[in-house]
A protein has these predicted regions:
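Short, charged/small-residue-rich alpha-helical element at the C-terminal edge
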Residues: 232-304
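Conserved ABC ATPase "signature" region
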Residues: 100, 104, 111-129
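Catalytic Walker B motif of ABC-type/P-loop ATPase nucleotide-binding domains
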Residues: 158-161
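Helical segment within the ABC ATPase nucleotide-binding domain
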Residues: 173-186
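Conserved catalytic motifs of ABC-family nucleotide-binding domains
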Residues: 154
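A short, flexible loop at the N-terminus of ABC-type nucleotide-binding domains that lies
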Residues: 1-4, 9-23, 30, 73
Length: 310
């Protein structure tokens, strides 16, 4: 469904150059749910802006369903739906009018628009509010309407740019129920950018992006196995964090530590060592508490980039 080859995007301004996307290669199959994970500034939004024909690449090639995004942008747009990170609804129109306008842009006939609007607004529990102005909607309701609108023309590819940012956990779960239902019904490909680990965890595959580079692509489980079987989390004094990091690097070769200013440090348990207790007994300073957990995608990002997601 998506073929990306040596994609680069460079922004130039006042004599300076910024490489937003740096020679990435990626293939995504039809019906696949792919998540692109990374912090702000990693290049995620630039990548989907090229994918959705909003931006042109500096170099490389991108195809959607066999169509080149530079050569055939209008045809590509017919095949994609996109939910932007920032709101894009017209709040002076009603929910139904927003759906109607979107359907007209995609050339749907009046009967098609009527059928699709009713089915999708019912799916996202907004049919009873269809005549209300969008300006009266809560943030969660607006997000649900944006999803319904993005599905109006039954796209082959749904692009989601941080679709649940700023929403409460309950609303986020509801949004994803709608997305997964639509994907199952229509065999749609989903391309998600997010920094919510639990959203990326439900994808078929995850790409880890940092500073414009795609540093890893695999299933969530395989990526987490690269970290190791377990992660140790320690609570200590904040001024003891650096000595512990230095000790771990010097004697165990551990450089992939996650540290916060409150005195918490986490790191993968070295394979072949005598266990967590044996390591902790050798560490400098006072250890106030210890827990052991399975690796998550944040640990993957730290190992791949040497940095925290935040």
């Amino acid at each position: 469904m998506i073929e990306i080859r040596q994609l680069s995007k460079i922004f130039s301004s006042s004599g300076s150059r910024r490489v937003a996307v740096n020679k990435i290669d990626l293939s995504i199959g039809k019906g696949e749910f792919f998540a692109l994970l990374g912090p702000n500034g990693a290049g995620k939004t630039t990548t989907i802006s090229i994918l959705s024909t909003i931006l042109k690449p500096t170099s490389g090639e991108v195809k959607v369903d066999g169509l080149n995004v530079v050569d055939s942008p209008h045809l590509v747009r017919q095949k994609i739906g996109i939910i932007f990170q920032d709101p894009s609804l017209d709040d002076r129109l009603s929910a139904l009018e927003n759906m109607e306008f979107h359907g007209r842009l995609y050339g749907l006939s009046r009967p098609q628009r009527m059928v699709q609007s009713e089915a999708l607004l019912k799916m996202v529990d907004l049919w009873e509010r269809r005549q209300d102005l969008v300006r009266t909607f809560s943030g969660g309701m607006r997000r649900r309407l944006e999803i319904a609108r993005g599905l109006m023309h039954h796209p082959k590819l749904l692009i989601l740019d941080e679709p649940t940012i700023g929403l409460d956990p309950k609303t986020r779960r509801t949004i994803w129920e709608y997305i997964h239902l639509s994907r199952k019904q229509w065999g749609m490909t989903v391309f998600l950018t997010t920094h919510y680990l639990e959203e990326a965890d439900s994808a078929d595959r995850v790409g880890v992006m940092d500073e414009g580079r795609l540093v890893a692509v695999d299933t969530p489980e395989k990526l987490k196995k690269m970290v190791g079987p377990e992660v140790i989390v320690l609570q200590t004094d904040p001024d003891n964090l650096e000595p512990i990091q230095n000790y771990l690097e010097k004697f165990f070769g551990i450089v992939d530590c996650h540290v916060d200013s409150e005195g918490e440090i986490s790191f993968p348990l070295p394979i072949g060592e005598e266990g967590a207790i044996g390591i902790i007994r050798k560490l400098p300073g006072t250890i106030r508490a210890m827990t052991i957990r399975k690796p998550d995608l944040d640990d993957v990002f730290i190992q791949m980039t040497g940095k925290n997601m935040a």
